[in-house]
Curated annotation (Swiss-Prot):
GO CC terms, sorted: plasma membrane
Membrane topology: Single-pass type I membrane protein
Location in or out of the cell: Cell membrane
Segments annotated as LRR repeats: 375-396, 399-422, 423-444, 447-467
Binding site for ATP: 588-596, 610
Catalytic activity: L-seryl-[protein] + ATP = O-phospho-L-seryl-[protein] + ADP + H(+); L-threonyl-[protein] + ATP = O-phospho-L-threonyl-[protein] + ADP + H(+)
Intervals, Cytoplasmic compartment: 545-892
Family, similarity comment: Belongs to the protein kinase superfamily. Ser/Thr protein kinase family.
Protein name, entry field: Putative leucine-rich repeat receptor-like serine/threonine-protein kinase At2g04300
Domain Protein kinase: 582-855
Length: 892
């Protein structure tokens, strides 16, 4: 049998509860949603006699479907919530919409009983979605007539609205009998990523009872299991304290199973489907025997032959829960947990209960919530009753709402609505004010309806809007001048006979701020100007071609920037640069490029002016690269270029001013370190990651930054992060193209060792550098420190983790004010980013998703007192009956 006591990192987490952390009285159903699907809306809420749970009709939570009842001969088999059902003969996707608390773990359970409601005696198969992602395939074949098919999942909400959708996949008509949501404590059932799909939940007893609410305050269902050939049962009538956050029912913890043979192991096996699935397990222990002075119960825990936890001693009459902090896999999908008595133990191991969940990753992000709220308001305003207008508006793409187009190009950014077409939809009333909240809208078509009132001025404020078609309505009044004068907008107001349209402005506008006929004049003028410019350029070319350029001098011709520069951004003269900086009065900083000065443009806009020093390690090539990159990329997390100066030997870049300096200054304490708590640091790196992900996936061609570090992450007055310093940036090849062989460039410590060794550049080089940044914000340690046993930060953190010393790497300035799970996830993410092999590193898209989940976890953290010790890949929670004391394991 293999033993690897240091193969997996251990973390031991203790909850001091004083019996008060999770007080939920029987009968308290706060936050519960219990829907009897198909119950008549005329029936009031009722209390189910079997469970004391209050159920209501689902009528207010779903906009489609018909109701039915199971065969009367089967009614005696089921509780009342199962007797009715809702079925969906129309449409492909039909959804329930439920209001939830953002960032909260919910146990979500859907139950299905066909019950021959239609008299056809057939099996059903359809898909169940949670938001835009597949949750489960529902097949009633096994339980065709008299069984309940149940799907359960524990899911952390990413918005204030949760949608559960039934998807028709073939000839079967989807059905549902009940839908239940139960909020859980946020510090329980956490995952690194994804959600937990229920596999089984057993308590080890000879009892036949299924335990649920009110015995379980969270309404989990516990099923008995007992191996008669290998186990014997222990029971107690004494009180067992089960309040450890997971709070298994007292009835469950009042019994336990132990091997019949005193020296035999306690074994439990199960299978995973598919065999490659990852899982989390939660084992609940309590020693329910009063031990004598000469008695000891101590055991090791093995998973698939590997040592996971040593010398565990269950507390007497108090509950401990052991679980993995990282998802596990089993070879061939066959899993076995063994509890082995140690040499010190006089008693065999025992266990009360085990829960196992498989991990489901949900890759699709929900549509931007502002857009969702806006389109729902528009739907309600006009009473749009399209069958497809259910669930997420944009994703999955095959279920996108009719009349919408969305931008879902970036997997790390929520999709946004860019096109709304409600033409010929029998709309009445005024133009809905909610349209102004679709801030990414590019095309709006409300033509051929019966809209009245005026053309609202807010349409001119939609910056992305390129096309508005309001033709064929009954609009009246004057057209706002701001709308008529908006450049780049194509406006069609034809057919509105009551509309006051000066100068024929109701005719389709050309998109350049004037009518189509004006375009002819513009084209003529532009054509003449183009001929003059081309002629002049040809003459200059013939003159300069005759001149020779000395080898040791860069000519002004060869130094010319891309011609697009002068048309896209302002080019400043050197005298203007001197004026804006007040003769270079205020220095903001110094870098490899040169000095950076404070300045103002037009006596209003603050800017940062970076001057190229003649002795700079960077030169005109880097200057040109940075200007040309910043002129073609625009992202909220990339520093914006206001302009540049290229006059003789005077080269400068004029950026937007970042009032809070760079991240490194704050990490060193130069700018007031009290602001940089864990949440703020997470927010900064999450935003920086979004900027870097845009360079990799949003640019054409995609770009590698090549110099990601804390000094190149700048912060504005609101501590919004923006990536800066693009002088070393290079494009990189797409998959299938030839790799780029470059001269190695970057900053020591942050430089990808694989890139340094091979000279082959790809986007994973940035991922490595970003991993170093992550380690900096977690540890607040220098990247290179020769006084450490391992000078480089990645090697040092790796050694500390191998020793199980997590506390030594976390910045003590946090003072324990952080979500332990989010810190662990960030550490593991950082270590995956600095994998020596680029193929083992995540993409920046994956990094963004992981950091956003860490941030969501930190944001949803509640005030629970807890201490953290490093012990490995297992966490466990203990409750002592002597309130105010902690259980501490032996040192390894």
């Amino acid at each position: 049998m293999k033993t690897h006591p240091q193969a997996i990192l251990l973390c031991v987490l203790f909850f001091i509860t004083f019996g008060l952390l999770h007080v939920v009285e029987a009968g308290n159903q706060e936050g519960f949603i219990s829907l009897d699907c198909g119950l008549s809306p005329n029936e009031p809420p009722y209390v189910d006699a079997a469970t004391d749970l209050t159920y209501t009709t689902d009528n207010d939570f779903v906009q489609s479907g018909k109701t039915g009842t199971i065969d009367k001969e089967l009614e005696s088999t089921y509780n009342k919530p199962i007797l009715q059902l809702r079925y969906f003969p129309e449409g492909v996707r039909n959804c329930y919409t439920l209001n939830v608390t953002l960032g909260t773990n919910y146990l979500i359970r859907a139950s299905f009983v066909y019950g021959n409601y239609d008299g056809l005696n057939k099996e059903l198969e359809f898909d169940l979605y949670l938001g835009p992602n597949l949750w489960a395939n529902v097949n009633t074949a096994v339980y065709l007539m008299n069984g309940v098919t149940t799907e359960e999942i524990i899911h952390s909400t990413k918005s204030k609205v949760l949608q559960v959708c039934l998807i028709k996949t073939g000839e079967s008509i989807p059905i549902i009998n009940s839908l239940e949501l139960r909020p859980l404590i946020n510090d329980t059932y956490n995952t690194q990523s994804g959600s937990l799909k229920y596999l089984f939940r057993n308590y080890f007893s000879t009892s036949r009872r299924i335990i649920r609410y009110p015995n379980d305050v969270n309404d989990r269902h516990w099923y008995p299991f007992f191996d008669e050939d290998a186990w014997t049962e222990l029971t107690t009538n004494l009180n067992v304290n089960s309040s450890n956050g997971y709070d298994p029912p007292k009835f469950v913890m009042a019994s336990a199973s132990t091997p019949i043979s005193k020296n035999a192991p306690f074994n439990f096996t199960w299978s995973l489907i598919p065999s490659t699935a990852k899982f989390y397990s939660y084992m609940h222990f309590a020693d329910i025997q009063t031990l004598q002075a000469n008695e000891t119960r101590e055991f090791d825990m093995m998973l698939n032959g590997n040592l996971a936890l040593e010398r565990y001693r269950p507390k007497t009459f108090a509950t401990g829960t052991i679980y993995f902090i990282k998802p596990q896999i089993c070879e061939g999908g066959q899993c076995i947990i063994e509890l082995l008595k140690t040499s010190k133990s006089t008693l065999p191991p025992l266990c009360s209960a085990l829960e196992v969940f498989t991990v489901i990753d949900f890759p699709e992000l929900e549509t931007n919530q502002d857009d969702v709220i806006a389109i729902k308001n528009i739907q309600n305003t006009y009473g749009v009753s399209k069958t497809s207008w259910q669930g997420d508006p944009c994703v999955p793409k095959r279920f996108m709402w009719d009349g919408l187009n969305c931008n879902n190009s970036y997997i790390s950014t929520p999709p946004t609505i860019t096109f709304l077409n409600l033409s010929s939809s029998h709309l009445t009333g005024i133009i809905a004010s909610a349209i102004q909240n679709l801030t990414h809208l590019q095309n709006l078509d409300l033509s051929n309806n019966n809209l009245t009132g005026g053309v609202p001025e807010f349409l001119a404020g939609l910056k992305s809007l390129l096309v508005i078609n309001l033709s064929g309505n009954n609009l009246s009044g004057s057209v706002p001048q701001t709308l008529l004068q908006k450049k780049g907008l194509k406006l069609n107001l034809e057919g509105n006979i009551y509309l006051n349209c000066p100068d024929g402005s109701c005719v389709s506008k050309d998109g350049n701020g004037g009518a189509k006929k004006k375009n002819v004049v513009v084209l003529v003028v532009v054509s003449i100007a183009l001929v003059v410019v081309l002629g002049s350029a040809l003459a200059l070319f013939l003159v300069f071609r005759k001149r020779k350029t000395p080898r040791n001098e860069v000519s002004r011709t060869s130094r010319s920037l891309d011609p697009t520069i002068t048309t896209k951004n302002r080019r400043f003269t050197y005298s203007e640069v001197v004026k804006m900086t007040n003769n270079f009065e205020k220095i903001l900083g110094k870098g490899g490029f040169g000095m950076v000065y404070h300045g103002t443009v037009n006596d209003a806009e603050q800017v940062a002016v970076k001057m190229l020093s003649p002795s700079s390690s960077q030169g005109y090539k880097e200057f040109k690269a940075e200007v040309e990159l910043l002129l073609r990329v625009h992202h909220k997390n990339l520093v914006g270029l206001v302009g540049y100066c290229d006059e003789g030997e005077n080269l400068s870049l004029i950026y937007e001013y970042m009032a809070k300096g760079d991240l490194k200054e704050h990490m060193l304490g130069n700018q007031g370190v009290s602001i940089l708590d864990w949440k703020t640091r997470l927010k900064i790196v999450a935003e920086s990651a979004q900027g870097l992900e845009y360079l990799h996936n949003g640019c054409k061609p995609p770009m590698v930054h090549r110099d990601v570090k804390t000094t190149n992450i700048l912060l504005d007055e609101h501590f919004q992060a923006k990536l800066a310093d693009f002088g070393l940036s290079r494009s990189f090849p797409l998959e299938g193209e030839t790799r780029v062989d470059t001269v190695v460039a970057g900053t020591p410590g942050y430089l990808d060792p694989e890139y340094y060794r091979t000279n082959w550049l790809n986007e994973k080089s940035d991922v490595y550098s970003f991993g170093i940044v992550l380690l900096e914000i977690i540890t607040n340690q220098h990247v290179i420190n020769q006084s450490r046993e391992k000078p480089h930060i990645a090697e040092w953190v790796g050694v500390m983790l191998t020793k199980g010393d997590i506390k030594s790497i976390i910045d003590p300035k946090f003072s324990g004010d952080y979500d332990a799970g989010s810190v662990w996830r960030a550490v593991e993410l950082a270590m995956s980013c600095v994998n020596p092999s680029s193929t083992g590193r995540p993409t920046m898209s994956q990094v963004v998703i992981e950091l956003n989940e860490c941030l969501a976890s930190e944001n949803s953290r509640r005030g629970m007192s807890q201490n953290m010790e490093s012990k490995g890949s297992i966490q466990y929670t203990e409750v002592s009956t002597n309130f105010g004391t902690e259980y501490t394991p032996e040192a390894r």
